[in-house]
Every structure is written in structure tokens, then in C-alpha cells.
Design a protein with these regions (language model features):
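Conserved, structured core segments of small domains
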Residues: 1-102
Length: 102
């Protein structure tokens, strides 16, 4: 079966910085597991001001690899930032990886 890549554009709710920081360890743990499995291409937060961490975040972007969209949806159901109301929504789009090769 060919694995599929997806871009996740995650938007934060306003006023969730403290909660985001509190829940971050669980979020990072799940991303580390994906990375250990070789299914995480890239992940990171989008700061409102890169020079001021207290300004908060617009959200996060991830590129992940799953066997099916359904498998990704199941994984997302357990995403701590979604479950705890940090993300207002996650936009999922298929992605055709061209570079880097391999």
C-alpha cells in the first residue's frame, strides 16, 4: 500500500496560550511517536511574533504520512490540542512530496 502525505494547517483559538503551553508535552509526545515511526515530515508552530513568545500563536503546521485519510482522522481524534480546545479547527489537504528525495 502506498502511504499518503497530508498537510495539516491548525488554527489556534484566541486566548489559549497558557493552555497550549500546559498541554504541549502530550502534543510533543504524539509527534515524537510519529517521528520515531518515520511518518512526520515536518511540524512546528506559527508564532504571532517570533521575537515575543508571549504574543501567542496563529497555530501549527504539520506534514504527516498515513496509509489512508481515515487513519489520519483517527489519529486526529486523539490530538491533545484539538481535544483541549486549543485548535479551533484543522484543515487537511493531500500533499505530493517531490523533494527531498527518499
Amino acid at each position: 500500500m502506498t502511504c499518503l502525505f497530508f498537510v495539516l494547517s491548525c488554527t489556534d483559538n484566541e486566548g489559549t496560550l497558557e493552555k497550549r503551553l500546559a498541554v504541549r508535552p502530550q502534543h510533543i509526545e504524539r509527534l515524537q511517536k510519529l517521528d520515531d515511526e518515520g511518518r512526520l515530515v515536518v511540524a512546528g508552530a506559527m508564532p504571532k511574533d517570533p521575537n515575543d513568545p508571549q504574543a501567542g500563536f496563529y497555530g501549527s503546521t504539520m506534514i504527516v504520512e498515513f496509509d489512508t485519510r481515515e487513519a489520519l482522522d483517527e489519529w486526529l481524534k486523539e490530538e491533545p490540542f484539538l481535544k483541549e480546545g486549543i485548535y479551533s479547527h484543522v484543515d487537511v489537504k493531500p500533499f505530493n512530496k517531490a523533494f527531498p528525495k527518499g
